[in-house]
Amino acid sequence: MTMTDPIADFLTRLRNANSAYHDEVTLPHSKLKANIAQILKNEGYISDFRTEDARVGKSLIVQLKYGPSRERSIAGLRRVSKPGLRVYAKSTNLPRVLGGLGVAIISTSSGLLTDRQAARQGVGGEVLAYVW
């Protein structure tokens, strides 16, 4: 059976592993998921990620990040644009997550960008997810 929304599956697996205080989570690999993981790493929400060749396909292994007393670095993840209802934003109307404390991940013609990077470059696109 094919997966309807692989990005929502990626975010749900991260959310569940984070809630259970797992150190890492293994996911099916895709370029889009690797790019989202790169944004999460650059913004400080995860410590690292790597790609491994599995018996069937590739796997993306994400190492979650916690504070000194095991407080979570990811407080929340939310899928915004879904297969049944796509959400787009112009460069002049980009969303701000928690007044700038969180990050919106936006798929643009320049690749995946955060809301701040997209505003700086003056591009809009599909709002994939919010992370805070």
From Swiss-Prot:
Report the Pfam families cross-referenced here.
Answer: Ribosomal_S8
**What's a single GO BP term from this record?**
translation
Classify the source by domain of life: Bacteria
- GO MF annotations for this entry? rRNA binding; structural constituent of ribosome
The UniProt keyword set, sorted, is: Ribonucleoprotein, Ribosomal protein, RNA-binding, rRNA-binding
Q: Which InterPro entries match?
A: Ribosomal_uS8, Ribosomal_uS8_CS, Ribosomal_uS8_sf
Any GO CC annotation of this UniProt entry = ribonucleoprotein complex
Q: Which Gene3D superfamilies does the UniProt entry name for this protein?
A: 3.30.1370.30, 3.30.1490.10
Tell me the function of this protein. One of the primary rRNA binding proteins, it binds directly to 16S rRNA central domain where it helps coordinate assembly of the platform of the 30S subunit.
The UniProt family comment states: Belongs to the universal ribosomal protein uS8 family.
Q: How does it assemble?
A: Part of the 30S ribosomal subunit. Contacts proteins S5 and S12.
What the entry lists under HAMAP family is as follows: Ribosomal_uS8_B
Q: What is this protein called?
A: Small ribosomal subunit protein uS8
